[in-house]
Amino acid sequence: MIRHVSVVLSLAIALCCPALATAQSAGQSGGELHFCLHGEPKTFNPLLVEDGQSETIRYLTGGVLIRFNRQTQALEPGLAVSWKTSPDGRTIKFNLRAGLHFSDGTPFNSEDVAYTMKALMDPQLHSPTGDSFRSGEGQIAIQTPSADSIVITFPAPVAGLERLFDQVAILSAHSPKKEMAVLGPFYVADYTPGSYVLLRRNTNYWKKDKEGKPLPYLDSIRLDIQLNHDIEILRFRRGEIHLINSLDADLFDRLQKESPAAAHDAGPSLDSEFVWFNQVPTAAFPEYKKNWFRTTEFRKAISLAINRADLSRIVYVGHAQPAYGPISPANHFWFNSALPTQQYDSAAALRLLARVGFRFDGGILRDSMGNRVEFTVITSAGNKPREQMVAMIQQDLSQIGIKVNMVTLDFPSLIERITRTYDYEACLLGFTNAGLDPNSQMNVWLSSAENHQWNPRQSRPATAWEAEIDRLMQAQASATSDKKRKADWDRVQQIVAEQQPFIYLINRDAMSAISPAVIGSAPSVLDPHAFWNAEVLRLGTDLSLGAQK
């Protein structure tokens, strides 16, 4: 899931030229790349990933059958040398690379793929990645004609099937190290909670460069756990880390002025920031608040009362656009351009609230029972743009008599609340979309899904509109015509705009910071923006990370 104070963020010290190792015309193999995670990884099991930190590790360590190139947006052979999908979209056959081994030396063959797919689709596992493959009732069928081939048949057609395998890291069926045995360019060598994750070069990795030299070039990647974005940019400027995958907008502008070669804006991203209300029936807060949150008019009024243009202008310094739905306008084909763009209108918000029994009394909004409208929004600690957005939303909603409190939590605690204990009222977070095909959002929109955040894991849809989204999601996932899929997805976006389960705020630009010492970088609009091609990254001949004197 992965996926970001009402004062302008300031640095503790004045910006100056970054103390970064100078890149040479040709890099060298070896060395250790340094960058930061913004929290603890929640899991090392690639099938259970739902947070950005764990996704970073999955991307760098997981071997996949098919890789979606973040720059060309083309599908490339991975562990599979070739594949073929049946005309009805239900069956896919993979021809696997022979002679490969996991990082611990365990041989790789079709049994590992079969084992992974069975685990992925096991309903007891509740895999967010597995949700993307659920297109119909019934079980998948798997055949392994040989050690180097596998045939997977789904109960119904799966649209965009090939692209989905970019998210499926293959597990070993036999290694005693279980999910820690990997087929990607790096493996997890060390983890100190609260400090760092160390990845080392997988010497069994199958890829080679054009000259036949084994990849990756790097010896290791150190991922320091750093929640505070201010400290992260200071460490980048001192040369202690080599890149920042997602850079805050105001820090981007300052870095661009001081070191243009290190600041990269790849343009509008697919990512979104949004707020939602907890509608889980068993949540431990008063029933009258649950009634507010379940009321469509209440959610729509909140949406009307938030000034998205100000969020884009002030928080993101113009490096973002107001968002009104689940698909970014940067995703040209799938974006529904007919969606209404609700403009900031506090008077209209009050009229809408009055229709469902709320009254504005002496500058305070009360419900029909006289309860003051007040709620708490949780967000991730150390993420200044999110903290600043909550602070600005506090100001906006105070104009219609609503009191908003803010609580910031470290990321593991926040994830625990929104996925396990449901001990919260509202949350501001974001989703990172790694691919263009919206089928990757199945784990958000199906009412039974893990990331259906406002009310996850429903045994049956709680509302008629959620049932309709379920039907449309299943229909588009089974359709073989892009025209039919587009029509279904347009309708899903329309329902989301009408019901506002997520109140979308902004789509930000893909901004990153990359040291000139990093050779081979090619920032992408798709995540991971700065290290999608980590296997071919090199460091300049000066590998020192010390600050300049």
Task: Please provide the spans of the model-predicted regions.
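Surface-exposed binding/hinge segments that line
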Residues: S25, N95, T129-S175, D190-T192
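Alpha-helical secondary-structure segments
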Residues: H34, N109-T116, A147-T153, P185, ...
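N-terminal lobe/hinge region of extracytoplasmic solute-binding protein
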Residues: C36-P87, K118
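Gly/Pro-rich hinge or "lid" segments in bacterial periplasmic/extracellular proteins
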Residues: N69-Q71, R163-R222, D230-I231, F335, ...
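Aromatic- and charge-enriched surface segment that lines or borders ligand/interaction sites
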Residues: V81-H126, V151, E232-R235, N291-R294
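Extracellular/periplasmic solute-recognition and catalytic clefts
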Residues: L120-P123, S127, A141-Q143, A189-R200, ...
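Detector for C-terminal structural segments
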Residues: T192-Y196, D265-E273, A301-T341, D345-L350, ...
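Ligand-site clamp/hinge motif
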Residues: Y205-R254, Q394, K403-N405, D410
